[in-house]
């Protein structure tokens, strides 16, 4: 069955690929004076028809989890792709904890791999490798050799904009994993969700709190009335300034709230910094009030992830913040998501995180690659809808591993084991080149992964209606000089702002101290920082008509 799908995909690919020119000159770096390298000029792409008459091999470096299959040649997807294309992808799988160091080292050598994937790098590094002639431009190959990816980029202009450098070139291939075309409903529009112990609420005869004042009353009751056998009750816990465990979502009851990089956008498209806003101060002072009364865990400033997880899983925390309710372990059934709270003046707002349904810097083809057209055409097979799902999660009819899916006609259906166990998925998947759009569910695969579907329902029904901002800060691909300047300012400024954020929760802040803090932000360059971030937002908006990004056509309509 998979062979039939492969043949159908290959046939479509061959028909769509038009000859643009010869392959000559498409490999190798360009030497400049002094022995340095310069960007590789874009080469003409060449039509490719699979299966090739003669076998072609290319090398690809990737990362792998320590508990999953290390030998990618044993994976059914890799074997089936070779059979269908007559292209051998020679994977060099590097353990997760060593990958970042090893791929950087490999890209500094003359015998670098043809492809490096699962890098997850940002524009500054992408442009750095491009200027050295390590990464080659890919937009010509996308147009000629990658019809599946092109279809996705045409349907999602925000993804195309995010991978297009200021010089007009595309140097890396993304992955896309989308759960909704409504950006306010995607599962990553917010990060940490507050989960409250409803068993304790029922035990005390209390209703779900709807305001910040009511939450304080509930936390006081937890502290005074609840007894546990395995330690002391912790009414409220989180990890300040830590991804997906920070309480910034609850600060929206006082205005803008907070997110992990502290950039937000007003509905008239103005970028601002949350930790320089008066209403963010009010929210932090509310947390200080709770902290001063002993209602907030004193370890919020210092506990690591393992300590926090163990504490929540012990069942003695009344309210905790995390991406997933499952952090509560055996006590998960006792918790529910805390709905958006109204602040003292009635404000209800859920702040957006600047998370995206794609990653811009996943896969690059290097100047060592002798036949980029063949390699890009090969990688494009994984951007076909059904293949994308298998690349991301795993496959079916594999006699050597527990299967993630079965297949009925063109529909993939989750197995019980595949849906439940990430290791089973990692043994079969590649998780590098894929694009899963929200309209694929129910067409190419029977349903979402259960945990994603649960979070999507939670976000879309409980939190999305209270998201007041129409924009998050996008994945803007800015000029290298602007990226450099942002980094220069942001490194110290963000560290200082987050330090003061934690200090306010612990000790509160006076008007004079707040003014001193704002003056220090000015001295550190916050005005220039926001100007540069605004420039990036405006550029992205111009490229994508961002107001409608991701909400129009489907890939199938292109």
What kind of feature is each model-predicted range?
Residues 385-508, 551:
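Conserved small-residue motifs centered on glycine
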Residues 4, 75-91, 105, 194, ...:
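Extracytoplasmic/periplasmic ligand-capture domains
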Residues 127-128, 241-265, 288-443:
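Extracytoplasmic/periplasmic substrate-binding proteins
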Residues 1-13:
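Bacterial Sec-dependent N-terminal signal peptides
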Residues 8-11, 26-217, 261-263, 272-273, ...:
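Conserved N-terminal structural module of periplasmic/extracytoplasmic solute-binding proteins
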Residues 21-25:
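C-terminal motif of bacterial Sec signal peptides marking the signal peptidase cleavage site
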Residues 139, 169-170, 174-245, 265-311, ...:
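Helix-loop-helix "hinge/cap" segment bordering the ligand-binding cleft or interdomain interface
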Residues 111-113, 231, 316-317:
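Short, high-confidence coil segments that cap the C-terminus of an alpha-helix
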